[in-house]
Each structure stands twice: as C-alpha cells, then as structure tokens.
Amino acid sequence: MDNQNIRIRLKAYDHRVLDNSTKEIVNTAKRTGARVRGPIPLPTHIEKFTVNRSPHVDKKSREQFEIRTHRRLLDIVEPTPQTVDALMKLDLAAGVDVEIKL
C-alpha cells in the first residue's frame, strides 16, 4: 500500500481479553512485514450507576455499580497487502470491539 497507516482501536470490558487480542494483532502484523506502533493504552472509561438498595424507602441507603471500558490503540505503519489479508482473516475473541481506520 502506498504510504498509508492503519489505525486500530480496541475496546473491551475485560483487560486480559483485550491484551490477548492486541498481542494477536501485533504478531500478525509483524509476521507479514509491517511495522507496528503501540499498543498504546488509552484512558479507561468508568461509567457508574447508583441505585437505591430498597424498592421504596431509605433514600440514604444506596449501592453503586460500575462498568469499566478498557481501550488500546495500534498503528500499523506501511502495511503490505499480505498484512491486510492476514488482519481480515484474523479471528479475535468475543467481547472485543474493533474499529479500523485507514
């Protein structure tokens, strides 16, 4: 490909699954002859939910839940056509959201 970069953003709730998927992508890209920048850990997005413990009374008694979204960024510099084919065929774990920009 003519001087292009592929930017891959990964999101997951479990950081271990995310790191394994990141390693798979990096190994695949390096094996096919592309240079990889990253993985760059992006800030973890924490979404908190506060709910009452009881159904009707005791406003002061509450419980908090949170969802943590872990994110990583990868840049593949000067990808070869073999790199693009290998990345298309790559089967990542369930629960990992992948965004690809050229």
From Swiss-Prot:
PROSITE patterns: RIBOSOMAL_S10. It holds the Pfam family Ribosomal_S10. It comes from the Bacteria. The keyword Ribonucleoprotein applies. One of its GO terms (cellular component) is ribosome. Keywords: Ribonucleoprotein, Ribosomal protein. One of its GO terms (molecular function) is structural constituent of ribosome. Gene3D superfamilies: Ribosomal protein S10 domain. Involved in the binding of tRNA to the ribosomes. Belongs to the universal ribosomal protein uS10 family. Part of the 30S ribosomal subunit. This is Small ribosomal subunit protein uS10. The gene is rpsJ.
